């Protein structure tokens, strides 16, 4: 796990390495839901306790610590659209190893564009996030027949929250 700052008021600044990549596959079998979709590898939210930080770095090939890199799978929506044509209907978890609404999503809109593909085929969706950016997509989310959107709030103390989830939206947001 990443070390915590000694002073809870200390702001953590990290350099973020962003790499735009192309995905061969985006709709993958999951042991939790039927499928998972991860338009990003890496996560700016950088939760200190996240299970993904323990194994994703090994699979990503990055030398940077977890929370300091994000690979943006630029063709995620297009690849997903093709895969959905052949897929058996099932619940899709967006995203199993990152927050689908991490700050870069505001620029790239990959989660939003993937949601459009899933909506067109009416696949059930499950989203877990710590970001207020999910509100941007309410127009799409309300169109699904089957959808779950969960928000994780670890603590009501903003200072402690920033220690453990430095890139998450504030509790007030």
Question: Where would I find each of the regions flagged by the language model?
Answer:
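Conserved AdoMet/S-adenosylmethionine-binding subsite of the radical SAM
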Residues: 75-173
